[in-house]
Amino acid sequence: MQPYTKNWTQVTEFVMMGFAGIHEAHLLFFILFLTMYLFTLVENLAIILVVGLDHRLRRPMYFFLTHLSCLEIWYTSVTVPKMLAGFIGVDGGKNISYADCLSQLFIFTFLGATECFLLAAMAYDRYVAICMPLHYGAFVSWGTCIRLAAACWLVGFLTPILPIYLLSQLTFYGPNVIDHFSCDASPLLALSCSDVTWKETVDFLVSLAVLLASSMVIAVSYGNIVWTLLHIRSAAERWKAFSTCAAHLTVVSLFYGTLFFMYVQTKVTSSINFNKVVSVFYSVVTPMLNPLIYSLRNKEVKGALGRVFSLNFWKGQ
């Protein structure tokens, strides 16, 4: 932290270092992340298109998957294009204004929190479908789905308001180089000339509340699902259900594990380079894996993809 001096000028622009230690491999990493980004866009757009066009998928589960796909597109698009511009040295690709930096962090936090709550809602949907199939229509009606989705987006939007407001009250007189590929809270706090103790505490509590609340719903839901599956007599059906749950839990564990590591910590002095690697997992890798695990492995979605992208489907429209 630097001492306050009245004639210092407030920083109006930041420079993002990105992955500064890999200059020789910038083109390789550009191609890698561009491929992953485009793959994520194609996957999620395909799911949105298929669910929207195939009436057989007009069910609550696919309603939530559509919301998740929309969210993943926006989630990756907040940070990845700027990161790609920095890799290839586009003019101003590493520069970002103070206002744009706060906006990027707000949107990214909003979408990340919303995804946590959406994953919890989807886990609850699967819990009711598997553990209480006879009551599924009563507990997961279309009205309930709409209210759950709206609540996820609303609470997600409210989540970053206080943290970003507190961040906007901090002073930044320089240096203005962010040791990250996006405007993340920890490297920003490391640059502030103000006392960041209160800001760190609020970030910790907000992150902990979001992650614990949503992960507890997921843990309880899947715990009950596993208990129910253990009582299925057919070994083939039990194995099929277990493999699906294991795939879901793998992605959820990766997403939540990286988020817990990144945001439920109170010191900005943690390894920035390791944080950047962890950030790649929840901002690039997980959004690419989610459609594969939640949707594209699903036989109904595969069948719908075949129908939607067949000539007969479009001739009948």
UniProtKB/Swiss-Prot annotation:
Cytoplasmic compartment ranges equal 49-56, 125-143, 222-241, 297-317
Transmembrane regions listed in the UniProt entry: 28-48, 57-77, 104-124, 144-164, 202-221, 242-262, 276-296
- Keyword set for this entry? Cell membrane, Disulfide bond, G-protein coupled receptor, Glycoprotein, Membrane, Olfaction, Receptor, Sensory transduction, Transducer, Transmembrane, Transmembrane helix
Q: Which InterPro entries match?
A: GPCR_Rhodpsn, GPCR_Rhodpsn_7TM, Olfact_rcpt, Olfactory_GPCR1
Q: What cellular component terms from Gene Ontology apply here?
A: plasma membrane
Tagged with keyword Membrane: yes
Q: Which residues are glycosylated?
A: N7, N95
Single GO BP term: detection of chemical stimulus involved in sensory perception of smell
Subcellular location(s) of the protein? Cell membrane
Superkingdom, natural source: Eukaryota
Which regions face the Extracellular side of the membrane? 1-27, 78-103, 165-201, 263-275
Q: Give the function comment from the record.
A: Odorant receptor.
Q: Which family is it part of?
A: Belongs to the G-protein coupled receptor 1 family.
Protein name, UniProt field: Olfactory receptor 6Q1
